[in-house]
């Protein structure tokens, strides 16, 4: 095994700079294959790499080859299988488990022991040894001894050093010079000893010969040391001299440092003083303006504004650390605070006086607007107050409590002022709308009957308001009283819903203009006030309130909440919300007054809701385009809901009145009242809603109304006793069709076609029903002829039937001479004239249809005679031309 180890070292490991430490002859467990060797090696160069190498003998058996190598650090477990009994098997756990069988247990133990020592030395006990004897691993040996053992092993490994080529060559030369070296080793050793003695003697003589030179060298060294001592003495003297100079230089340096430090401190102190003087010194002119400056003139306001800005800058200056500890700074800050408080009180007091004065000045102008439908102009007041806008901004940032108090006072004064102005404005609008004067208000104190008489008396003297009639009285109308369907109302104070038919176009146009004038006056008033509030109270620049707001009192003295007109408290989260809340409080009377005006307009004429819906929708749309969340947009939107509700109520009332309408049992029906009402409504609506934004609402109303008209026309026609059902249906649907054709309402195209179809169907039905059988006996005769033909008798053979021969035919024809026919047609014309109404003018249409139907029957009889009685020469005693002449003369005679 030693020879194999030396061979492997020489052939495989030495070329790779490796040393072989241990070797074991193994084969794989369970397989009968050639043996191989597992070798434990280390590299000769650092860092040391430890490997386990598998070496296999070549197939020819003359040399070894390296098959595979594993780094020892990759070895996880060494399993000896049995720690007590001798067992040549062992496992090495690399990336997978390798099972080996050693040629002997001793070789296995020696190899495992080597692996253990390498693990102790290079891997810091990383490998786990399983089923290995404790004696083998030297666990009983202390750590120090273990290290010595490991070191000894390394030394044992180092005992063997292979000769290099030069050493081998020298040994060979020496041995060639001594032939006896091999035959007589003792002689060779003795020779070597003698040569060694000769060499030692030569070395001693050489040393003794160099003694003189050594003495000379020692003498030179002594002289050099003496020179060095002298130089050191001179250097010491120089050092003492330099030490005094160093002390003087240190003193000068320290003095310069102190001078520089003093200068630096002086510069910094001057800078701090200049900073405080420049930033915390308020000019005397500013102080005077704050204490007693004029707050009336523009120049005085400008001076106060500049002084307030300068004061704010001085108070808001960012002091450097330590400044607030200075007594002068504290005194100056206290002086600034006193100036701020004093000026804030002066400013708040002055502005409160301005608000009060404005209320008195505006009140004096109310009389001028009491007879005109205009609102007083607040622009001069806004213009004067806007001069204080910058001061209000200053007050807001410095003393929010006084700022909020001014806001509350402004809202209180202005809300009362606007309430008076707006109520007077709406009173004028109501008077112009109803055509009354202020004196009519005193009628409210009169008894109901006396008030009604007074109102009727005024209407007889030319009052422009025609407040008569009630749409709720349709159920009391008769066809005969269609010219005067409505009863007069008792008074303005007790008005019901007015009928649109009693108000002419001029009255409705007047209402439209008044309502538009009201909205046109309110809109700029609200926008101007909102713009003024935004600019004067500086609420448009920041979205969030300052932190100080939460500490200030609100407009009502509590937390920062605003109360809507509905009574609920709303938190103000932004300045935009605050503007809206201020507008709500200032103009809290606008929405109720608008609703009252709308209610009055609806009472005067329910059709006024059409005008109001269009106008209000347009103004809401305009306001929302400017600011959807503004007070004006919200208020008009709420009022629009009321207007839309009134519009829907108007439609519902019309449908209800259709259902409640009653007709006279003694007179002909004619055009039903609600059909005429629908025509009036549609014509008015089309003129109002032309290019309007709410066209969709009108289309929905059209659909509801037309369905109600169709249903109730049929209902009335079924209940009619005096007028035939077909006449009622024909006349009313003809009127509806004519109305829809004239107005060209796109959403009612299907209903227009339906009305035309119903008119046509009932016209045909009425013609057939009224015409009946004018030639009754002749008609019965030919019905019998047609019955025989239907039974299978040929037409030309019918004349051979006893009851239908030529003689019977001539007998029947003689009973209807032209004179009798004309008399029958004349009676029919009178009957139709009695059924039809003059309003629709359908008499000639119906008469022409009857003429066509009579001619059709005549032609039918002529055809039967020609087919069933060919060559008989039998003909009617009157011709088609006679029929045309009869009908024409009858129509002209009436």
Swiss-Prot record:
Keywords: Cell membrane, Coiled coil, Cytoplasm, Exocytosis, Membrane, Phosphoprotein, Protein transport, Transport. It comes from the Eukaryota. Residues 460-491 have a biased composition (Low complexity). Residues 438-459 have a biased composition (Basic and acidic residues). Residues 152-199, 205-259 form a coiled coil. CDD domains: PH-EXOC1. GO terms for biological process: embryo implantation; membrane fission; mitotic cytokinesis; protein transport; vesicle docking involved in exocytosis; vesicle tethering involved in exocytosis. Residues 437-495 are annotated as: Disordered. The modification Phosphothreonine is found at residue 471. The modification Phosphoserine is found at residues 470, 473, 487, 501. InterPro entries: Sec3-PIP2_bind, Sec3_C, Sec3_CC. Pfam families: Sec3-PIP2_bind, Sec3_C-term, Sec3_CC. One of its GO terms (cellular component) is plasma membrane. It is found in: Midbody, Midbody ring; Cytoplasm; Cytoplasm, Perinuclear region; Cell membrane. Component of the exocyst complex involved in the docking of exocytic vesicles with fusion sites on the plasma membrane. Belongs to the SEC3 family. This is Exocyst complex component 1. It comes from Mus musculus (Mouse). The lineage of its organism: Eukaryota, Metazoa, Chordata, Craniata, Vertebrata. The gene is Exoc1.
């Amino acid at each position: 095994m030693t020879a194999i180890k030396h061979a492997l070292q020489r052939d495989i490991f030495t070329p790779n700079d490796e040393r072989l430490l241990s070797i074991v002859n193994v084969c794989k467990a369970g397989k009968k294959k050639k043996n191989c060797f597992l070798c434990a090696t280390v590299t000769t160069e650092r860092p040391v790499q430890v490997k386990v190498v598998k070496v296999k003998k070549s197939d020819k058996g003359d040399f070894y080859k390296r098959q595979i190598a594993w780094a020892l650090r990759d070895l996880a477990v060494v399993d000896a299988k049995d720690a007590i009994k001798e067992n040549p098997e062992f496992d090495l756990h690399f990336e997978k488990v390798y099972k080996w069988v050693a040629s002997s247990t001793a070789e296995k133990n020696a190899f495992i022991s080597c692996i253990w020592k390498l693990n102790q030395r290079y891997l810091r006990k990383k490998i786990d040894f399983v089923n290995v004897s404790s004696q083998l691993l030297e666990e009983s040996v202390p750590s120090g001894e273990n290290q010595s053992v490991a070191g000894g092993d390394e030394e044992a490994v180092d005992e063997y050093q292979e000769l290099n080529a030069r050493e081998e060559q020298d040994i060979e030369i020496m041995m060639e010079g001594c032939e006896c070296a091999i035959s007589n080793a003792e002689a060779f050793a003795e020779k070597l000893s003698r040569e060694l003695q000769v060499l030692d003697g030569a070395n001693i003589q050489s040393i003794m010969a160099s003694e003189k030179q050594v003495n000379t060298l020692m003498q030179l060294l002594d002289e050099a040391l003496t020179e060095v001592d002298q130089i050191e003495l001179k250097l010491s003297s120089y050092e003492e001299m330099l030490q005094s100079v160093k002390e003087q230089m240190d003193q000068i340096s320290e003095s310069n440092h102190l001078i520089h430090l003093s200068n630096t401190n002086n510069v910094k102190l001057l800078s701090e003083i200049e900073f405080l003087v420049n930033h915390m010194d308020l000019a005397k002119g500013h102080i005077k303006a704050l204490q007693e400056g004029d707050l009336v003139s523009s120049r005085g306001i400008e001076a106060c504004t500049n002084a307030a800005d300068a004061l704010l800058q001085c108070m808001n200056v960012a002091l450097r650390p330590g400044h607030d500890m200075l007594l002068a700074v504290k005194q100056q800050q206290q002086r600034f605070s006193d100036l701020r408080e004093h000026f804030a009180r002066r400013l708040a007091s002055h502005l409160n006086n301005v608000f009060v004065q404005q209320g008195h000045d505006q009140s004096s102008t109310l009389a001028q607007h009491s007879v005109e439908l205009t609102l007083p102009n607040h622009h001069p007041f806004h213009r004067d107050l806007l001069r204080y806008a910058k001061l209000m901004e200053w007050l807001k940032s410095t003393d929010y409590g006084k700022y909020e108090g001014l806001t509350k006072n402004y809202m209180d004064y202005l809300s009362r002022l606007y309430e008076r102005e707006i109520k007077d404005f709406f009173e004028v609008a109501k008077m112009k709308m109803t055509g009354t004067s202020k004196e009519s208000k005193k009628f409210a104190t009169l008894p109901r009957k006396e008030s009604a008489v007074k109102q009727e008396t005024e209407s007889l003297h030319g009052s422009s308001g025609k407040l008569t009639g009630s749409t709720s009285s349709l159920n009391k109308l008769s066809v005969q009283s269609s010219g005067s369907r409505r009863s007069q109302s008792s008074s303005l104070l007790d008005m019901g819903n007015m009928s649109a038919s009693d108000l002419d176009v001029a009255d409705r146009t007047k209402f439209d203009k008044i309502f538009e004038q009201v909205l046109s006056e309110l809109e700029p008033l609200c926008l101007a006030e909102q713009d003024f509030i935004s600019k004067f109270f500086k609420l448009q620049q920041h979205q969030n309130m300052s932190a100080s707001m939460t500490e200030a009192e609100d407009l009502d003295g509590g937390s920062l909440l605003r109360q809507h007109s509905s009574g609920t408290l709303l938190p103000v989260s932004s300045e935009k919300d605050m503007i809206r809340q201020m507008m709500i409080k200032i103009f809290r009377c606008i929405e109720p007054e608008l609703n009252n005006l709308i209610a009055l307009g609806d009472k005067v004429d329910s059709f006024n809701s059409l005008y109001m819906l269009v106008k209000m929708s347009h103004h809401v749309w305009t306001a929302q385009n400017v600011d959807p969340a503004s007070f004006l947009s919200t208020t008009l939107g709420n009022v629009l809901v009321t207007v839309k509700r009134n519009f829907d109520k108007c439609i519902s009332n019309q449908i209800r009145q259709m259902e409640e309408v009653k007709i006279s049992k003694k007179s002909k029906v004619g055009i039903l009242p609600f059909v005429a009402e629908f025509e009036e409504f549609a014509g008015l609506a089309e003129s109002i809603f032309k290019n309007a934004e709410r066209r969709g609402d009108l289309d929905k109303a059209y659909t509801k109304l037309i369905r109600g008209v169709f249903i109730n026309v049929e209902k009335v026609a079924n209940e009619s006793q005096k007028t035939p059902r077909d006449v009622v249906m024909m006349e009313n649907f003809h009127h509806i069709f004519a109305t829809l054709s004239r107005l060209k309402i796109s959403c009612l195209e299907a209903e227009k076609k339906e009305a035309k179809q119903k008119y046509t169907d009932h016209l045909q039905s009425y013609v057939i029903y009224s015409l009946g059988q004018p030639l009754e006996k002749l008609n019965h005769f030919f019905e019998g002829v047609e019955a025989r033909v239907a039974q299978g008798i040929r037409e030309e053979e019918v004349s051979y039937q006893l009851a239908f021969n030529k003689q019977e035919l001539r007998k029947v024809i003689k009973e209807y001479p032209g004179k009798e026919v004309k008399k029958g047609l004349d009676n029919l014309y009178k009957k139709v004239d009695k059924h039809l109404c003059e309003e629709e003018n359908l008499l000639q249409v119906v008469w022409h249809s009857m003429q066509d139907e009579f001619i059709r029957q005549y032609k039918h009889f002529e055809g039967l005679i020609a087919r069933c009685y060919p060559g008989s020469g039998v003909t009617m005693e009157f011709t088609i031309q006679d029929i045309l002449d009869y009908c024409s003369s009858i129509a002209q005679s009436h």
